[in-house]
From Swiss-Prot:
GO terms for biological process: immune response; inflammatory response; insulin secretion; lipid metabolic process; negative regulation of heterotypic cell-cell adhesion; negative regulation of interleukin-1-mediated signaling pathway; response to glucocorticoid. PANTHER family: INTERLEUKIN-1 FAMILY MEMBER, INTERLEUKIN-1 RECEPTOR ANTAGONIST PROTEIN. It is found in: Secreted. It comes from Canis lupus familiaris. This is Interleukin-1 receptor antagonist protein. It comes from the Eukaryota. The lineage of its organism: Eukaryota, Metazoa, Chordata, Craniata, Vertebrata. Belongs to the IL-1 family.
Length: 176
């Protein structure tokens, strides 16, 4: 009988990381929280990479696999995290300007962020588990979810229509 490595094992690893890291982070303390790197890919197997200072999702093969960005994760609350790349030096942020809501990378050190600051709310994402996958909802813009397009090599963005077939809002993780 052939054994299958289930994505559920990745989710369990991620949840164990969160529960362990929560004890390492004091909600009101100044002690830095523990950051860990994870591989992230959507349910269509697209991974994240940086192109022209923009986070995109696509199918990396051969020598291009080295371009894959690991997602740096710092837990804020039991189901909330800060997300970054490049060793936590670039953080994912939800920015609202007028009627437009967009995802952008900001040059901020992920371990300098604090859940007690209102200004850092734009960097906070709420985790929602659905079986072996996880979705990320913006804390600053409720109802807006991290997503990838169905087409490869498109920017990682946000959508307020997670059920829409044109956007993918479910992701897998693998602890590095």
């Amino acid at each position: 009988m052939e054994t299958c490595r289930c994505p559920l094992s990745y989710l369990i690893s991620f949840l164990l990381f969160l529960s362990h890291s929560e004890t390492a982070c004091r909600p009101l303390g100044k002690r830095p929280c523990r950051m860990q790197a994870f591989r992230i890919w959507d349910v269509n197997q697209k991974t994240f990479y940086l192109r022209n200072n923009q986070l995109v999702a696509g199918y990396l093969q051969g020598s291009n696999t080295k371009l894959e960005e690991k997602l740096d994760v710092v837990p804020v609350e039991p189901h909330a995290v800060f997300l970054g790349i490049h060793g936590g030096k670039l953080c994912l942020a939800c920015v609202k300007s007028g009627d437009e809501t967009r995802l952008q990378l900001e040059a901020v050190n992920i371990t300098d962020l604090s859940k007690n600051k209102d200004q850092d709310k734009r960097f906070t994402f709420i985790l929602s588990d659905s079986g072996p996958t996880t979705s990320f909802e913006s804390a600053a813009c409720p109802g807006w979810f991290l997503c990838t397009a169905l087409e490869a090599d498109r920017p990682v963005s946000l959508t307020n229509r997670p059920e829409e077939a044109m956007m993918v809002t479910k992701f897998y993780f693998q602890k590095e």
